[in-house]
Amino acid sequence: MITRLPFDPDKLVAAMLYVASRVGDPTKFKIGKIIFLGDFVHIAKYGRAIVGGRYCALPNGPVPSEVLDLLNGLITGDVAPEFWGTGIETKLQVSGDPYPTFLPKAKPDMSTLSESDIEILDKVIAEFGQWNFHKLVEFTHSLPAYMKAAEREPDSRNPAMDYEDFFEGNSYVVPGTKQELLENYALSRAFPEQTLAV
């Protein structure tokens, strides 16, 4: 069971800026869902996540914990220490209440995103970026990875999703990518001090 993959705060910020600049309503919900779907598709096609981190099966669907924590920190003015060096406070402007949007004030650092990261983010934005809240909730609730997490931890308010479940019911799966993910994960556990492209 893989419930957390390594993540790079700078890459996460770049992905968030990229998404926020390309969707019409860059809310916490929309940014989180597009990044989740980006990882969901990228893992199936390439055997590694774009962003990684920990995903939880929350009532409105899968949520990347680090994205949620970062966006909540921007709202409250209390950004987590792992993001202090990213300059995120000057790169995304929080606007509106009670459902704030996150408007990019800087361009993403494209050097942190690979060609395949950009390919999949563009694909996911084109396919899901115009979907409304209810359609995204309904779709992500139907994914086996979401349902299995809720079944494994029925009493939890934020059950952890298993990355291995991302392959089930995923039409983007390329043969061999699950094994590649497992091998990359094993390497990241063996060499935690190194940032691996997992």
Regions found by a protein language model. Name each.
Residues 1-198:
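Domain-edge interaction signal
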